[in-house]
Amino acid sequence: MMEKGIWKDALIQSTKKLSPKLQVKNPVMLLVYVGAILATSLYFLGFFGISDEKSGYTLAIALILWFTVLFANFAEAIAEGRGRAQADSLKMARKDVLARKLKHIDDKTDVIEVASNDLKKDDIVYVLANEQIPMDGEVIEGAASVDESAITGESAPVIRESGGDRSAVTGGTTLVSDWLVIRVTAVSGESFLDKMIAMVEGASRKKTPNEIALQILLVTLSIIFLAVSATLLPFTEFASKQAGSGSAISITNVIALLVCLAPTTIGALLSSIGIAGMSRLNQANVLAMSGRAIEAAGDVDVLLLDKTGTITLGNRKASEFIPVDGVTEQELADAAQLSSIADETAEGRSIVVLAKERFDIRGRDFAEMHAEFVPFTATTRMSGIDYQENTIRKGAADAVRTYVTANGGTYPQECDAIVSKVAGAGGTPLVVVRNNKVLGVIYLKDIVKNGVKERFLDLRKMGIKTIMITGDNPMTAAAIAAEAGVDDFLAEATPEAKLELIREYQREGHLVAMTGDGTNDAPALAQADVAVAMNTGTQAAKEAGNMVDLDSSPTKLIDIVRIGKQLLMTRGALTTFSVANDLAKYFAIIPVLFYGIFPQLEALNLMGLTSPTSAILSAIIYNALIIIFLIPLSLKGVKYREMPAGKLLSRNMLIYGLGGLVAPFIAIKLIDMLLTVLGIV
């Protein structure tokens, strides 16, 4: 249930939206708006004896038309109100605070206190525990726990640190521990929080291409019905004279008939469907930079999914040291630990822990060793340490083979056998080499998440192809892909390989979605049709994507696709229902309206409507009430089911197409009976 305040605010907003400036934005409802004004004018003209229109009947038509416009405004106001309520909670996190601006990055005592709104890009700020981060930025020094609950709703603090893919921080979040030095990446008004508020309020929402195309269709239909209705006045006048019976249709009835036949149902709900779709995405803690991105998600037929965190649990754990002949397990463990000391990944830490547990290998004096750590990069796919004329590297088998060969060493065939065995079991092998001599393999164990196979099966039913992206060798990738049930995989993936894979599928006419969090993902994110950047990721990744997942959960991509498809389905279902409604109302009203001139048409009055007046009133009352009844469906969305597109279309055509034809006949007859019983007609 929505809060009482949202309903109250929506009622107020629906009256404010009666302004002509706002009504012009919806051409279909503008037709009803103008009709209401004309009917009201005719009532007053009849009241003062200037017109022959029946004053009581004309007043009833005018009031119903005004309520139709108000109901359409109410649908849009409710959708906007839900977004506004979410925006209000975000605004509480956005407040001007004093920031410590560093004059020199090396001197944390020499600071200038400035208001956060006055900070500029590339300013360096120093933030301590229990202080609010003043503006969006990149951590350039330090590591700390950050409370991001104001934005994500997740109460557990997250780690933010310099380097790597967890360096981005958001203004309005709070430091829980330690300290950070941050380089500002956005100015006031352009921050991530500002963009979120603008999106959920709908201030920056633009109509999507599909919405524009549908609105053009609805306007075209409305113009056709307007032309048809306009000709009824001279036609019925001529026909009544020729037939010698009946009378010309009144202007009030022409207005009412036009409103009944125009696609007012979908015209009234179209805006609220789009806003509600954006709101559902926001409730899933995903910020879309445009409505176009949500629609693209609904049309996606290829998903590129990172193995780690999406398909597997994410934290691979070192489970075994497997040395080659002539090398002891302890010797391999010692070298593996040294190469992983500076590795802050979960895998790196697990290697250090396993070496401690197995052989009690403890910390070293790296200053005395004159050690220099070599970080992992996507290009080399290795990390390690250089110390006292010793060089240790660990990494993917093919990367280590290239490294050893390039330096004049020999890569043993025995190592290939170990790598194949580990990969065949679904593990990840990391080869360790010291001074160009291969020592053995670290066995990292991957665990596939529960339930992913079933989810991929559902996606396959929907006609979506799933591709696992991993840096693992082909054998490991194949084993995990088979266990998880994905359609294909890309092994030993580099940024260039991801980019080329996306382009290849796009050339074949597919729409591609992917997730990413690192700077190296930025080119592929920029190329993908739906690009979901992780909130924990780098600024470059966020700027390249067209969506940001505040929870930084790679599995969210599947939910985003479902929300996108639900949006398109809801719009299609209600459009089908609206058009079917118009057809039914046409066959319900026209025979009754004209059987005074053409008595033969009485045979087509299948519902036995009492009179033309009753038929018009019943139809126009139904036309207004159906908008109110469909508001919950437009906000919640049509329930999405994992089934082939053809079956889904047939199902929805049966429910909303046939339902749209039957509902008006039943409802109009019931309203007609009620009006007759009450003596209104």
From Swiss-Prot:
GO cellular component, one term: plasma membrane
Protein known as: Potassium-transporting ATPase ATP-binding subunit
Membrane-protein topology: Multi-pass membrane protein
Family note: Belongs to the cation transport ATPase (P-type) (TC 3.A.3) family. Type IA subfamily.
Chain positions recorded as Mg(2+) binding sites: D517, D521
GO molecular-function terms, A-Z: ATP binding; ATP hydrolysis activity; magnesium ion binding; P-type potassium transmembrane transporter activity
Highest taxon above the source species: Bacteria
Catalytic activity: K(+)(out) + ATP + H2O = K(+)(in) + ADP + phosphate + H(+)
Keywords: ATP-binding, Cell membrane, Ion transport, Magnesium, Membrane, Metal-binding, Nucleotide-binding, Phosphoprotein, Potassium, Potassium transport, Translocase, Transmembrane, Transmembrane helix, Transport
Signal peptide segment: none
UniProt organism field: Listeria welshimeri serovar 6b (strain ATCC 35897 / DSM 20650 / CCUG 15529 / CIP 8149 / NCTC 11857 / SLCC 5334 / V8)
SUPFAM superfamilies noted in UniProt: Calcium ATPase, transduction domain A (SSF81653), Calcium ATPase, transmembrane domain M (SSF81665), HAD-like (SSF56784), Metal cation-transporting ATPase, ATP-binding domain N (SSF81660)
Subunit structure: The system is composed of three essential subunits: KdpA, KdpB and KdpC.
Biological role stated in the UniProt entry: Part of the high-affinity ATP-driven potassium transport (or Kdp) system, which catalyzes the hydrolysis of ATP coupled with the electrogenic transport of potassium into the cytoplasm. This subunit is responsible for energy coupling to the transport system and for the release of the potassium ions to the cytoplasm.
Subcellular location: Cell membrane
E.C. numbers: 7.2.2.6
Record-annotated membrane-spanning stretches: 30-50, 59-79, 216-236, 255-275, 587-607, 615-635, 661-681
Binding site for ATP: D343, E347, F376, T377, A378, T379, T380, R381, M382, S383, K394
InterPro entries for the chain: ATPase_P-typ_cyto_dom_N (IPR023299), ATPase_P-typ_P_site (IPR018303), ATPase_P-typ_TM_dom_sf (IPR023298), ATPase_P-typ_transduc_dom_A_sf (IPR008250), HAD-like_sf (IPR036412), HAD_sf (IPR023214), P-type_ATPase_bsu_IA (IPR006391), P_typ_ATPase (IPR001757)
Gene label: kdpB
Family annotation (Pfam families): E1-E2_ATPase (PF00122), Hydrolase (PF00702)
Chief location bin: membrane
Catalytic-site annotation from UniProt: D306
Signal among keywords: no
